[in-house]
């Protein structure tokens, strides 16, 4: 890189990626990857041949059958339409941009070694990147459909896992690895510049930034991510919780997920 041979630098990055030992990611255990029956279904539903039916938590197309995800296939039939919004519920749109089907699909790839799942990830995430560019810095992203900080955090946490499941995939090229890492950097920096002022959202955002910093220490901004994320988490121990340990949001579900974020 220092002598200007950027392609060779990228080749070395790929070699490093293939052989690296990842940090301890509490969300990934490669020694025992067994997708559930539902995860296998979600992996297959997301394929082009099944009309890009992307799993979203609690959102199903009743007209297509029992527990069948909605299709995000474009009307022209030749791609994905990320603006499809079947229910009109804001939460559904947010969940679409969390990419909740990608980890189940990655687990299915890892257990089967079927490259069609890796190729689908590359196709779908690559398309998402093109169709959902990051807003300019200074834009109010509090309720942004695809770049709301909470949803960015969910994507970032999952990207850290995806890069482990697909580590040895022959479909992951130098160019694709570079693209994923570039946008991992973009995601972490976006969160740091747009932390929520308070609430469980802020805790999840800090967890995501910390994950990126600790699991990808080779990246240029990793030290800043780790410092930022752990700093916010440390502050949240007192700012987001009552002295008895109860989350100030007051919701049991958020309390449990907030505690999980400190793992």
Segments from the language model and where they lie:
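Short alpha-helical hairpin
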Residues: 54-83, 95-96
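Short linear motifs in intrinsically disordered/low-complexity regions
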Residues: 3-6, 26, 30, 82, ...
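Extreme N-terminal leader/anchor segments
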Residues: 1-63, 71
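Aromatic-lined, polymer-binding surfaces characteristic
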Residues: 74-76, 86-263
């Amino acid at each position: 890189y220092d002598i200007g041979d950027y392609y060779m630098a990228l080749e070395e990055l790929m070699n490093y990626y293939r052989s690296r030992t990842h940090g301890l990611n509490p969300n990934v255990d490669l020694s025992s990857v067994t997708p559930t029956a539902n995860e296998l279904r979600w992996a297959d539903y997301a394929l082009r041949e099944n009309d890009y039916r992307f799993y979203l938590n609690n959102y199903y197309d009743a007209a297509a059958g029992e527990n069948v995800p909605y299709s995000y296939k474009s009307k022209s039939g030749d791609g994905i339409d990320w603006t499809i919004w079947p229910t009109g519920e804001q939460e559904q749109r947010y969940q679409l941009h969390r990419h909740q089907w990608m980890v189940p699909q990655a687990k299915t790839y890892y257990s089967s070694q079927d490259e069609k799942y890796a190729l689908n990830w590359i196709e779908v995430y690559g398309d998402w990147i093109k169709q959902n560019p990051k807003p300019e810095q200074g834009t109010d992203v509090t309720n942004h459909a695809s770049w709301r900080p909470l949803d960015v955090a969910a994507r970032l946490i999952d990207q850290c896992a995806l890069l482990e499941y697909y580590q040895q995939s022959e479909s992951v090229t130098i160019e694709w690895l570079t693209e994923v890492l570039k946008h991992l950097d973009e995601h972490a920096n976006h969160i740091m510049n747009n932390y929520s002022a308070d609430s469980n959202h802020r805790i999840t955002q800090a967890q995501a930034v910390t994950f990126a910093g600790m699991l990808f220490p080779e990246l240029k901004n990793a030290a800043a991510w780790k410092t930022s994320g752990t700093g916010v988490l440390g502050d949240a121990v007192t700012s987001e919780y009552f002295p008895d340990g109860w989350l100030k949001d007051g919701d049991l579900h958020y309390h449990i997920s907030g505690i999980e974020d400190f793992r």
